[in-house]
Every structure is written in structure tokens, then in C-alpha cells.
Amino acid sequence: MVGSAEPVVCQFYRLIPGAPEPRRADRSADGTLPVNAYRYCEAIASASSFGWYLYPPLSFSLWWDGTEIAWTYEGADEWYPLRGAQYPNFRETFQKVAPDGLGALAPPFLVQGMLPGVVQIWSGYLARTAPRWALLSRGAVNIPKTQGYENFEGIVETDTWFGPLFTNVRLTRTNSPVEFHMRRPLFQVQPLLRQCYQEPSFKVSEVADIKEDDWQRFADTIKPNTDQMRVLGHYAVDTRKRLRGGL
């Protein structure tokens, strides 16, 4: 949530009732980072906390035999072949709230991809970003991958494209259930300015091109690490002070 004076970069719209709310990603990678990394490695902690976690709208499982995919969900009595699957009873729910003429456009919850073992999973949300902002969709940052799937990464220009916020996953395990739980982040979205990914310019220079003030900055970075009695996490402390000062 933000105060009224702070502009909203991303707005999420919940379509599936009861779907878990997106949550700001946290510095501990949802509690999975080692304590030393969380306390002293600002680079890892900052990357972990960049963006928001999205969760499955219900707990479910996928089963891939190498050719066909089946799915089931909490409370179901059997496995169902997967082609395209709606969230239970969502079609009727959507028809009640959609404007006239749009009732047949309920987004599917699961869709089998064109590639073997690939499934598209919808979070239950739509998303819209401020002008010139997009969303990078990816796996949850620095959370160990132990669930038998990998997230594809993609950038969606959500300032103009207003549609379902989903992730594509590649199943990496066959002949055993791959489980997705409402309490575990399914994927992470990170806001990006368009100028950051539309082929920004770069330049390659040689060591002779390094200026004197750059050498001083290099020394300021490296010298503290040569002191065996140095205080751990000095970079983290300096970075946090600078951010608190708005620099």
C-alpha cells in the first residue's frame, strides 16, 4: 500500500474471489536466505525484495508423464486431463460481474503450452502499470527451486496491455506430482521503466581509460575487504544509509 502523495506504479485487480493478495517481496527471500546473506549481503537482499510475489489462487498439482499433463486440486476426487482449465466455478462468477458482451471472456486458470511440459498458470489478477512502466515476470528471486518446475521470464508492457497476470512454467519432473501451494510464491513481478530494456547503450573501454577518480572509487571499494578485522556488511550499512538519505 502507498500513501496518497506517492504515485502508484502498479495496480492489481483481483478477479478470482479469495485469491491471495500480491505481497511485496521480502529481503529474506520469503524466509529462505541464510542469516549471513540476509544481514550482510545487500546485493542479494535488495534483489530478493525487488517487486511483488504472486501466488496460486488455489492449491493444486500437476502430473506429467513426458507426453500428457493431468491436474487436480485441493478437494477434487480425481485427476483431470489438462488442455485448458477454468478455476472452479469461475466462469459463472465472471459472467455475473463482466459488462454485457464480455461474459464469455473469462481467463482460463491453466493452459497447456505448445512445448512439452509447459503450462501457463494464472494468478487470478489483472495488472496495470503507470505510463512507460512494464512488468518483468520471473521465478521468485533467490528462493530455492525444489518443486519440480522452472518459471520462464518475460516482460509485459502492462501500461498498454491489460490482461491476465500469469506465468509460464516448464515441468522438470515426470511421473510424480508437482505441487503448487497458495502459501508459496508462484512467481515474482518487478517494475521496469521501458528505457531499461529497449537496447540501452553501452561502451567497452580499456584499463588505460580509467580516470583518477574512478581508481579512487575502486580503492574505496576494494581496500576495506583486505582488512581482516573489518566490520562485516560495511557495503550493506553504507547502502542503507544512502537510501535512507534519498541518494
Predicted feature locations:
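Non-catalytic terminal segments and appended small domains
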Residues: M1-W161, T172-L247
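Active-site cofactor/co-catalyst pockets and adjacent glycine-rich loops in catalytic enzymes
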Residues: P164
